[in-house]
From Swiss-Prot:
Keywords: ATP-binding, NAD, Nucleotide-binding, Nucleotidyltransferase, Pyridine nucleotide biosynthesis, Transferase. Pathway: Cofactor biosynthesis; NAD(+) biosynthesis; deamido-NAD(+) from nicotinate D-ribonucleotide: step 1/1. This is Probable nicotinate-nucleotide adenylyltransferase. It catalyses: nicotinate beta-D-ribonucleotide + ATP + H(+) = deamido-NAD(+) + diphosphate. One of its GO terms (biological process) is NAD biosynthetic process. Catalyzes the reversible adenylation of nicotinate mononucleotide (NaMN) to nicotinic acid adenine dinucleotide (NaAD). PANTHER family: NICOTINATE-NUCLEOTIDE ADENYLYLTRANSFERASE-RELATED, PHOSPHOPANTETHEINE ADENYLYLTRANSFERASE. Its EC number is 2.7.7.18. The gene is nadD. GO terms for molecular function: ATP binding; nicotinate-nucleotide adenylyltransferase activity.
Length: 189
């Protein structure tokens, strides 16, 4: 049975902390396939500072090139509108019948799983991988995997804000992503 990891997020923009999560999960689980799953619109997040989706996909590909593993699953982008993980996983599972699916979330998402659409069915379809960046270890449900990762306080919001204020984002994102953001004039408004 094939082991597939899905790492979802808005990735607006993708940054160094996302890379650390991907790397830690990849090396811990050693999956056959690893997918970055950019959302079109998350139902649990406020939406502002949105850029053309092609920019996000380009920056994710830059991260994949740098990490040396991974692919992009753009199912939610193609579907458009609000993205419910349940719908995405259900469709993905139909395409990958003989696969064991792992879905990466942070402790912030773990602590609000009860708000997720069709969460009980979703728990039957995937094994949640809960990444914890806090000093305290996170207890998770028995059917889930907890992975402790180094704490790096970087957020996409912070990066967008720094760019709009004309501040440096060096090392917050890889050089290729930094150059792309500057070259395309993203987040400057």
């Amino acid at each position: 049975m094939k082991k597939i990891v899905l790492y979802g997020g808005q990735f607006n923009p993708i940054h160094t902390a996302h890379m650390i999560v991907a790397s830690e999960v990849f090396h811990e689980l050693q999956p056959d396939e690893f997918y970055f799953l950019p959302s079109f619109m998350s139902p649990l997040k406020k939406h502002h500072d949105f850029i053309d989706v092609q920019h996000r996909l380009t920056m994710i590909q830059m991260i994949i090139d740098e990490l040396g593993f991974g692919d992009i699953c753009d199912d939610e982008i193609k579907r458009g509108g609000q993205s419910y993980t349940y719908d995405t996983i259900k469709a993905f599972k139909e395409q990958h019948k003989d696969s064991e699916l792992y879905f990466v979330i942070g402790t912030d998402q773990y602590n609000q799983l009860e708000k997720w659409y069709q969460i009980e069915y979703l728990k039957e379809m995937v094994t949640f991988v809960v990444v914890n960046r806090d000093k305290n270890s996170q207890n998770v449900e028995n059917a889930m995997i907890a992975i402790q990762i180094p704490r790096v306080d970087i957020s996409s919001t912070m990066i967008r804000q720094r760019v709009s204020e004309g501040k440096s984002i060096q090392v917050l994102v890889p050089k290729s992503v930094e150059n792309y953001i500057k070259g395309e004039g993203l987040y400057e408004h």
